[in-house]
Amino acid sequence: MAQSDVAAVWNPALRSDDNATPVPTGPASLEIDTSIEATTIPLGSPMETPHEYSISDIAFPDSDTAAPPQEAASPDMIDTEPLPNPDQIPARDEVLEAPSADVEATPEISYDHETPNLDAPQTEHAHDNEAMPLDDPEDQVTEAQPAQPQAEDSISTEATAAQDMDVEEQSSTPHAGDQDGTEPADTNGEAHSSHDIWGSPAKENSAEDDFFNQLKTQTKPIYVPPENESRFEEGVPLLDDSAESPVEPTATQEGQIDNLFTDDNDEDDGFFKAVQSSPPPDKSQPASHITRKSTFQVMDSLGFSLDSPMSDADPAAQEFDNALAAATTNNSVGISAFEEDPAAQEFDNVLAAAATDNSADKPSSEEDPAAQELDNVLAAATTNNSVGISAFEEDPAAQEFDNVLAAAATDNTVRKSSSEEDLAARWQAELAEEEAEVAPSEDDLAARWQMELDDDDDLLLEDDIGGATAEHAPTSQNINGATAGAAVPGLSSPFGTPQSSVRPGAPATAYTPHQPSTSDLLQGVPVPGAAPPANMAASADYFTQPPRPNVTANKAESFAERAKEGYRSPYDLPEDLTRPRRPVASHKPVVTQPGSTPPPPRSNSIPIPPPSTSMPPPPLGAQPDGAQSTAKVAAPKNFYEELPLPPPRPQSRPASSGRYTPGANAMPPASSHPPPPPANPYASLSTAPPAAAEAYSQPQVQQPEGLDPYASLSAPGASSGPAPPSATSRYSPKPPTLQAGIKPPPSPRYSPAPPPATAPPPRNRYASQPTAPPSQGVALPFQPRTSSPLAYHEKVSYRPQEPSEQQPSAMEQPAIIPPIEVQSQPTAPAEYSPIQPPEVPHVPEAVNMGSSVHQMSQQPMSPPRNQYAPPGYVDEFSKRIAPIANVPPAPVLPADDPTFVPPRRSMTQSPSQQTLGPRLSVPSVDPLQRPASVHGAGSPTKAVNPYAPAQMSAHNRVASQSLEFIPPTDDQQFDPLERWKGAPIVKFGFGGSVLSCFPKHIPRYSAGQATPKIKSTPGEVKTHQLSDWIPVPDTIARHPGPLKSKSKKKDLLAWLSSKIAAFENEGIPQAVYMHADSQKRSEEKILLWKVVRVLVEHDGVLEGSPEIQKSLRQIIFPHLQDVDSAQPYGNGLPSFSTAQSLDAPSRPDAADPQAVESIRNNLLVGEREKAVWGAVDHRLWGHAMIIASTMDKSVWKQVVQEFVRREVRSASGNTESLAALYEIFAGNVEESVDELVPPSARAGLQMVSKVDGHGTSKNALDGLDSWRDTLGLVLSNRSSEDYQALLALGRLLQSYGRTEAAHICFIFSRAAVFGGVDDPQASVVLLGADHQHLSLAALQDEDSILLTEAYEYATSVLSASPKPPLPHLLAFKLVYAWSLADQGRKSEAQQYCDAIAATLKATTKPSPYQHQHLYFGVDELSARLRQTTSDGGSSWISRPSMEKVSGSMWAKFNSFVAGEDNEAGSAGSAKAGDGDIGPFAKIAGTPTVSRSPSVSDIYGSYSAQPSYSSGPSRYQPNNQYAPTSSPEQLRGRSSLDSQRSSSYGFGFGQRRGSQEPSTPVESNMYQGGMLYNSPPAVGYQSTPPQTSYMPLAPVKEDLAPQAHAEASAGPVEQSYGSGSPYQPAGYGSFDQPFMNQVPSDGAGYMPPGVSSGYEPPAIESHPEPVAAPSEEVNEEEPAKKKSFMDDDDDDDIAARAAAIQKAERARKDREADEAFRKAAEADAQKPAPAKKSWFGGWFGGAAGGKKEDLNPNKPIRAKLGEENSFYYDKDLKKWVNKKDPNSATAARATPPPPRASGPPSRTASGSSAAPPPPASASPMMPPPSSRPPSTTGMPPPGSPAPSSLGVPPPSIQRSVSTGAAVSTPPSGLAAPPRPATSLSNASSIDDLLGAPTARKGAAAKGKKKGRYVDVMAK
């Protein structure tokens, strides 16, 4: 190519199209060209742009010679530039001698054809440093062959291309020599002294030695622009005859690029010059004239025979050979791309590869785009070539060539060191091959260069890039000269060029750290070379990228190009001139590169797998740039171990290598050993190359790790050794070996480019990094990249980090994590296996980049890493999955090196995960790298790993977890579950409370133990609210339930609207998501809620008004709204249907005259039916229907049905709904649904209609979807029986699981049955809940419960004609109340309990759903709620509450007023009450008697409990405490147990045992009279006031009234005997349950307490009862009362039985006047005490005198005498009742009798009291037995009561009714209830106060007290 072309080559803007697309000279050239394309930098790319300086000017004194090197440096840029003509470059016959099978016959590349030259160098470069092909084919290849048999082998495989390229380069050497004559080839591993690229190996060797020496000692950027430029200017041949020249060929190509950069940057030139000056490790080998070795020879020379400690010169040579072979393969492709000018094109490819890396660097070093880019390429090449040189030292020619390749691949420093002449020769050879191949188009080159420049980004200063690259290259070169060379081979070897150079743009970039921003990113994400190092030698070579598609494709695919996709124009200025910020796509091209590159490299790289540690094995393709690290990486592995880690030179910016070169930086060291699956270049991609580069750079200059944006920075860092912490590793301590001075290459996260392969195995940012700082690893999260890393980051973040990351220190292990390959090489999933990548260290950078790109793409294939998941976990998962994805997991995470970067997965993982075993040592963790490793692609977000700090913690965690526990010595240590170690304990309690206890692990140290042992002890027990842990989602509107009044309507509508909106927003509920009709059901659910909202909004009406119809129509047919709104506009205009009818004139049915005549004839005869069917047969439907309308209804139905079948259903369209409507009109209601789903379909059959042919045309079940249309038609056209059709439709829908739709139909039908689950006739249990197909758990859905409650509210509360509430819904309300309590919403739960109790009380007709279990459940919940709310905790010491305080005060006051305090009974009751009130009231113990009576009172008042609770229970000390005290009493009785058991239904027996007498009585009352009725409700209400105990007791009564009677203490049943005990109890409970109950409860139990507290009412009643039954009876009653006083502890049964008998006798016979007189006297005496006890007693005193006066009159009046008549007071009236107002007395006595009965039983005046109780008791007796029927039992008791005392039974009924209403009476006592309530109150007081009931006076007082209590209750 012309010299101008050369200048254009390195400057993409100046490069010409012919350079971009050189003509391939042959298959080798084609191969090289491909690689060149992969590495070729777009003409517009910065690498090319610098070409404004002619390569000859910059790199070579001779412009002719310079051109090729520049092209080599940046194939894309230089493609247009003609490299030195083949005649100038010594013919590489020697190289051709052993043409490699990998290397297709590479025609000699004239300098005009730079691409061929590139091909050879790239191949070599791919293998070692792309330098060998570039080196003088004659001298260096020859030397390389002897010096490095492996390199020779690889060359032999690549020999054809390489030799041809050498020869061509030699022929073109004059150009290269001229350009490189002054400049060392080290800069890019290209011929720095192009005039003597192949010819002056000695000079090259010396330069390389100097370079390596400088790298060893140098910590600053390797670039020394003045020196480098001078070296180029001096014309020092990059490749001498010495071994150096073989390495240099690759370097030569890059050397030109470097020289270009060198001209731009003296600093870079100086650096490369220094590199040249430093003798390459392999320099020792004789500097025989470079002759192109056979691929095998090159491979042998590369065979890890690198100078670097990692590999010997032979391995380097072998690896170089492999790289050369891969490069040849790739270069052949690249050459094909550059067929126009093979030499120029391959050189362009090489230059593109170098430029790709350098471009990333060049953006930062824009000052001299050409010089910097060339320097960057040279730096990458040097880094790679250094390794290659070391490998080729044995054979001066071959080794120097390898070294040059290594230098070119690494940082081009080695390339500079290699003679520029050799480089020129090699470039010519490569260019010749490239020309033979297709020269990449200038556009491609420009795009590549631009992408490279973009990769470099502004953050990547060109100087830094060059320096960083140089540093990395020298470092890796010194460390692994062979490795660098191996990586560089891509430049020199045809194999490496296409892949490496083209893919990365400058594949060397992948391995060349000089482009820190991009290359570091790539390195962070192991440069493709790293991932496929072994596999992708060619791709690794900067110029060897044969697998890579044509330059354009590669460019698109290459990471750098992708980064610069937006900057691809071949005319765009290079980044040096113009700094593109971050083309997002530019990174991907590099990634893509491996995709195209990998195939050949894989074949090449397949060989690489064996050399997991040895570089020769790495595939040449992988070797090129990435291979530099890869092939060299084999050495680098050892290199890290062997190579001293000089402090990495702090890079002013991350490794100069472009984002594509990041792999180059870290890659050479990374791939000290080829990844076990080198075949998968992507798998190995991330491993060795980056690591090699890093390690390489660490010892020497510590080139910043070229972080693969996708490779974890840590991995590259690990490979590079103490690489400066990458930005990602910022959070983790820098590896101790990190050299802060060296600026780690920008973390790949900024560059999405897949160069990760380039990067040495991405260090686990979370794992300690190897001592060698991952120079590439430093990726500052703030550093921008030219391309957005996000494109790859997500992939990488989810991709397991490559083992390379885990292999930190060993260059072999720190393989570059394969960057995600945008190019899409998912084939290498294994590459992502953390283990595998380390094996790939040999893959050339370009290859690594490509493979890393592939890996990046593949990584997603491997278990995607969640970048947000802690690395530790992600790493584990990636390890599990990634190995699967990555077939070769061979490279195990370097456990040996704690600094080893964990596999790539660590990249995506948090440090904690990567801090696995080896990572416990954090020293090598790069804070910056850590994010990269976490995120894999080094995304900006990933770069900063929030988990990075966790890395340390993770280590600690592991350590802490490993601590041993101190086992107990009490045999607990034998527990197989090891519970003695402690475990969290969580207990969920009532009311949403949660107890938690977490064990405490206390470390205990013992003598002689370095680590403590853990002692597990119980932790603190804490109480929480469940809502604190699981917040209940707050809706916009809270449910206003319970819904009791119309005032809740507005709130309910708001709540319904909010729920509907929530349903619409949330979409398909998860519950029905799996349902086949989930979408439909979701819509139907919303529709159901809307219908209920309309129902509530219109007060339970769904039809009748246009407004309602419109609302429903809008809901059911939302689309009709538009029609309605559009109607006004259509007024006067025909509707659409009308227009259709106009368009298609209607045609009357074909009227067959004969058919009409037949109908007429039939009608004439009178055979209408025959006429009808004749009309039907002839489809004369009008005739048929008219005639049928006059006939029987059945005929009409049949005709319509036939019409529907034949005319409607046969019509096309959705006619099911219309057919159903017609059927309904015809009266075929049940059959109407058959039109939707035919019976055959419901039966599971599919019938085929032969008539209409539509039988199988559609799914028969599709008709279900017409339910909405059908419903709308029916609602809009109501008929008499359409409700039945809606029922049938609902049942049909329900049978198919369309529950919501079915319930909508049921609601509109207004005939559906709402019932319980056990009701087979029930159509609906809960709206929206399918009770037929789903489990009962579905019936606990809160939404369904509340929706049904809203429906009930609308129909029963809001409706003008309310329906009865749904009885079965009470149980579900209780369930909801429990759920509220569990949520901590106890007040709302209490409200529901009260509402349920009120409903039960208000119920007049018992329902089977109102049963004892429901009562008990309400009582239990209410009791618990009262306990929790009043006590405020579970403490056994109840908190004082106003209720308690007021209750105790009122108890004392009542007792004082009643005078019970002095009474033993009252005192006892008071004591009992006090005990209940006191803090120890709940603790068992207080007298069971008092407690049982209290319970009995509670039960007695249970029916009246509402009043009791409202009044007496609240105010009575004991009952007041009943909420508290009554519960306490229960507890005292061990009622806690009973209470609990009662709550469960088991303890009732226990309670009753203690409370049996009273409980049975009340329970009889409730159960007998009100099991399902109000009594239970009353009981519940009463219980609420009494708290848990009251409810519990009633529950017990309700639950086991009989059982208690039976099970209750023998006294209960015994005393109650058969029915009588219950009768008294029932009677007493109704009239004054306390009197009766107390005795009944057991005369001994509560009588005292009961009498004292409640006797006042009882006393009141006593006079009345006495009067009512008879005086004798009354007298008997007092006696009984006394006996009861004595018998408080005795059973009431006997007393009641006697009292009953006496009462009956008194009522029947009415004793003699004496008896009456006695009764009157007794009555007179009673009133006085009563008056004393009561305020009325005062009046009673006067009355008493009157009574005494009247006593004589008694005989006059009859039994009672006139005395009663004298007294008109209530008491007197009672007496008077005997005279005139007997009936009135009886009526008035009616209420008292219970009281009297109560007192008589208590007082032992069983005769008088007995009669009334018996009367009531007798009724009650049936209840006990009939008690289960409860309600029925109740009425009977009431009715029987009248038997003896007509009035008392009513009172009993009242009490019973009050029992139901009793709960209500507490607040307001009706006259009848009032006695009952007073009685109940008295009984409650008695319960609390004790047995004072024995005394009549006390009883009277009790009466008053009861009144007071009642008043307070009110």
Swiss-Prot record:
It comes from the Eukaryota. Residues 315-422 are annotated as: 4 X 27 AA approximate tandem repeats. Keywords: Autophagy, Endoplasmic reticulum, ER-Golgi transport, Membrane, Protein transport, Repeat, Transport. Sequence repeats lie at residues 315-341, 342-368, 369-395, 396-422. Residues 1-31, 58-294, 352-376, 469-873, 1506-1568, 1600-1763, 1776-1914 are annotated as: Disordered. GO terms for biological process: autophagy; Golgi organization; intracellular transport; protein localization to endoplasmic reticulum exit site; protein transport; vesicle-mediated transport. Residues 596-621, 671-680, 743-763, 1810-1827 have a biased composition (Pro residues). Residues 526-540, 709-721, 1532-1543, 1725-1736, 1798-1809 have a biased composition (Low complexity). The keyword Heme does not apply. It is found in: Endoplasmic reticulum membrane. Residues 142-160, 285-294, 512-521, 849-860, 1506-1528, 1555-1566, 1852-1866 have a biased composition (Polar residues). It is a peripheral membrane protein. Pfam families: Sec16, Sec16_N, TPR_Sec16. GO terms for cellular component: endoplasmic reticulum exit site; endoplasmic reticulum membrane; ER to Golgi transport vesicle membrane. The keyword Repeat applies. Its main location: endoplasmic reticulum. Residues 110-130, 558-567, 1702-1724 have a biased composition (Basic and acidic residues). Involved in the initiation of assembly of the COPII coat required for the formation of transport vesicles from the endoplasmic reticulum (ER) and the selection of cargo molecules. Also involved in autophagy. PANTHER family: RGPR-RELATED (PTHR13402), SECRETORY 16, ISOFORM I (PTHR13402:SF6). Belongs to the SEC16 family. This is COPII coat assembly protein sec16. It comes from Aspergillus niger (strain ATCC MYA-4892 / CBS 513.88 / FGSC A1513).
